[in-house]
């Protein structure tokens, strides 16, 4: 079986989210797509999979609507369903920072293309922050990146208030899996008064796709939020499992986090 997996998001003022939810639910069901779509007044965040023709038709119909015109998305070919079912939900935020009043559609950090990221990493004045959660960072990251030690994205503002703002850095560069978290985090940092904020365009996955393994600076694997669990520097799927007891990604038969024996699992308990 050959399927196409797409991931996309956009911060855009979105009215009548319930109407959009029903339309997307009906469209995806008719096309036989699986995955998750989150809608909020701040925009859309989605990961979907289906056959090539169905994905192409979905994107064509979606982009006919002004809020989603010229939508950027990442795609990958997978051999099995990365999602078990379809979920279309309305939430207060498409990625939960706990700041629904924040408006990333108006102001975010400067996007840095993958081709320019390595040069930025060499700037000693840049404070590099991995915006992901600690269990994701445990699998891999960029050298010298700060781990905020968060268990969820909503913890990030506390890290900023307690660790970053007492001595505000002149420049901050941030990255995450696909770009959405660092885009929203960059809006938060700008609101807190940090003047120069950079974000990796398209996130780690875009960087790994654009930069050859012998030239990229990524170390380890990258956690992804589907049944692949993680990808390596070549965007191949290593043999990670999710511990059924604590939900952490592991490669051994015993979970190093909770010491429980690991049976093959594709979703947290």
From Swiss-Prot:
Decide whether keyword Oxidoreductase is in the record.
Answer: yes
The catalytic activity, as recorded, is: uridine(34) in tRNA + AH2 + O2 = 5-hydroxyuridine(34) in tRNA + A + H2O
Q: Does the keyword Oxidoreductase apply?
A: yes
Active site at: 176 (cysteine persulfide intermediate)
The enzyme's E.C. designation: 1.14.-.-
Enzyme category, top tier = oxidoreductase
Q: Which residues form the Rhodanese domain?
A: 122-216
Q: Which GO terms describe its biological process?
A: tRNA modification
Top-rank lineage group of the source organism = Bacteria
Keyword terms = Oxidoreductase, tRNA processing
GO molecular function (one): oxidoreductase activity, acting on paired donors, with incorporation or reduction of molecular oxygen
| Similarity-based family | Belongs to the TrhO family.
Purpose? Catalyzes oxygen-dependent 5-hydroxyuridine (ho5U) modification at position 34 in tRNAs.
The protein's matches in PANTHER family, at most eight in alphabetical order, are given as:
RHODANESE-LIKE DOMAIN-CONTAINING PROTEIN 7-RELATED, THIOSULFATE SULFURTRANSFERASE/RHODANESE-LIKE DOMAIN-CONTAINING PROTEIN 2
Q: What is this protein called?
A: tRNA uridine(34) hydroxylase
- Per the UniProt record, the source organism is Synechococcus elongatus (strain ATCC 33912 / PCC 7942 / FACHB-805) (Anacystis nidulans R2)
């Amino acid at each position: 079986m050959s399927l196409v997996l797409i991931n996309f998001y956009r911060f855009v003022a979105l009215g009548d989210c319930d109407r959009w939810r029903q339309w997307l639910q009906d469209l995806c069901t008719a096309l036989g797509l699986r995955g998750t779509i989150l809608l909020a007044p701040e925009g859309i965040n989605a990961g979907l999979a289906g056959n090539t023709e169905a994905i192409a038709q979905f994107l064509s119909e979606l982009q006919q609507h002004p809020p989603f015109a010229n939508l950027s998305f990442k795609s990958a070919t997978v051999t099995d369903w990365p999602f078990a079912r379809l979920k279309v939900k309305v939430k207060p935020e498409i990625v939960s920072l706990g700041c629904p009043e924040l408006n990333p559609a108006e102001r975010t950090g400067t996007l840095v293309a993958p081709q320019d990221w390595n040069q930025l990493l060499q700037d000693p004045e840049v404070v590099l922050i991995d915006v992901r959660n600690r269990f994701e960072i445990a699998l891999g990251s960029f050298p010298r990146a700060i781990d905020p030690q968060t268990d969820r994205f909503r913890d990030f503002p506390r890290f900023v208030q307690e660790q970053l703002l007492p001595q505000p850095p002149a420049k901050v560069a941030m990255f995450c899996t696909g770009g959405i978290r660092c885009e929203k985090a960059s809006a938060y940092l700008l609101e807190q008064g940090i003047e120069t904020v950079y974000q990796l365009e398209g996130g780690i996955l875009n960087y790994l796709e654009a930069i050859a393994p012998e030239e990229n600076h990524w170390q380890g694997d990258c956690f992804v939020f589907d049944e692949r669990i993680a990808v390596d520097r070549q965007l191949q799927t290593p043999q990670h499992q999710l511990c059924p007891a604590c939900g952490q990604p592991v490669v051994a038969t015993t979970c190093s986090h909770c010491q429980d024996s690991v049976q093959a699992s594709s979703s947290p308990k």
